[in-house]
Amino acid sequence: MKNDLETCAEEYSALLDQACMNVGADLFEDQIEIFVLAMAKARFSAAKSLANHSGADHQDLAKYFLASTLRELDRLLLADPTVYGLSQPEISGKEAINEPLKPENVTKIGKQYASAPLPDIHLASEHEIIRKTFSDFSDKHIKPVAQKIHNENLLVPKSLIEPLKDLGTFGLSIPEKFGGLKPDDREDLITMVIVTEELSAGSLGAAGSLITRPEIIARALLEGGTEQQKNKWLGKIASGETLCAVSVTEANAGSDVASVSLSASKTEGGYILNGSKLWCTFAGAANVILVLARTDKTEKSHKGLSLFMVEKPSSESDEFEFSQDSGGRMTGKAIKTLGYRGMHSFEMSYTDFFVPEENLIGGDTGLNRGFYYTMKGFLNGRLQTAARACGLMRSAYESTRAFATDRSIFNKKLVDHPLTLRKIADMAGLISASRTYTLDVAKKMEQGGGALDANLVKLFACQSAERVARDALQLHGGMGYAQEPEVSRHFVDAKVLSIFEGTEETLAVRVVGREMTVN
């Protein structure tokens, strides 16, 4: 039997759906309304996921997070319902929202999670073994060097990459028949999600993102590559013999992938690349870069794009240049960043650079289909980015909880102050909802669905990571603003999550918004 809060949630859910149908479908003129609704839908979906997976010990947290979500929905939709084509509805049992939000209930939740673990995510036994393996690896190998890599802007050391190769980390999305760990007959996105979370808990830049590029390239090859290409590349990527990067973004084509202009002109035996790219992460160390280029200049949209596997020597330098005997040239220069350090993101330039025709993904069949192959990889990449956000905020939360327990202020432990307890309750809710929703989406995608949810969970988890990292730093006070504590790294790393793999605004309006307003 449903309680009043659940009944109230159903009515708000119906209101949200109605608002999505009512709002205009003009992705330019109506983008403010679309953005608000997309973010609301993302949070509401996460709140439902947490409510569905919370056992008896964590019901208070689930109710608090759901009530907070409904209170926010009420503010967004009903302050002026005419904006979304709604009348002024009467919500049954609306007072049910108030009880979980009372200060005494919030501090009770904060006290619970100040001394107890976050809700269990209920993994199958084989997945729990994998999670524990990578959690131990993160504690032993990644966390001890993560802050040094960040503070000194170092490249990920081989002492991390080599054991990750041995664990099969780079082959999580590659079928066993090609040398990877993914079963040949089914998807296993749960493994990818939990491994990503554990590595990201150690370091987002130096570990959690190492498997994103193999994930995107593997999906593109499996979707559109020829059998010869799959046999040539997938095994080497899975073993870590071939390190890889992905090069899509340009100065005037960030999240607007369809506007890519780097050209690939047909020549005897292959193609000539001319143009530049930005934000090509790990381009220096990589042996191959997946490059999205325009092969048909008569098509100004996504229809004229193709994908190429561009081979190069590995380099550990912040700047590199590779010249071909034919006169072609590739250069790369690392971009200095606030955070997300360890893999280095490069500005790339290609001048008359020759790529053999066998490196066009899909061969002749793949010509001008690169956009579709890229999007296939990005969809899984967005799920993985949600997992990266989960790992980062969990790490920020755990270090902050320990700090608050030890720190005293005004003759009381920091953790005993009600405002601290409220922040702990908020962080626990955001992290737990992000984790359960990420796993729910992974299961949907394993069954062939979940495309919209992959975008929603990316929106929610990445925004949550910013909020958690901000509160974590705030609770550290002045020490949080110093370089030494890891929470300062969490703070600057969290910001990038809502930018890459599709900016928050573009994803909410152009991807989620298009789906919401059509359906």
Locations of regions flagged by a protein language model:
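Short, hydrophobic/aromatic alpha-helical segments in well-folded domains
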Residues: 216, 220, 232-233, 294, ...
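N-terminal glycine-rich flavin-associated loop
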Residues: 207-228, 254
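Glycine-rich, histidine-containing beta strand-loop boundary motifs that form or position
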Residues: 175-176, 209-211, 248, 275-277
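Alpha-helical interface subdomain recognition
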Residues: 1-201, 212, 224, 240, ...
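FAD-binding core of flavoproteins
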Residues: 1-8, 17, 118-123, 186, ...
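Core alpha/beta catalytic barrel or barrel-like domain that forms the active/cofactor pocket
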Residues: 206-214, 241-250, 450
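Alpha-helix capping at helix-to-loop junctions
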Residues: 201-205, 222-230, 239, 243
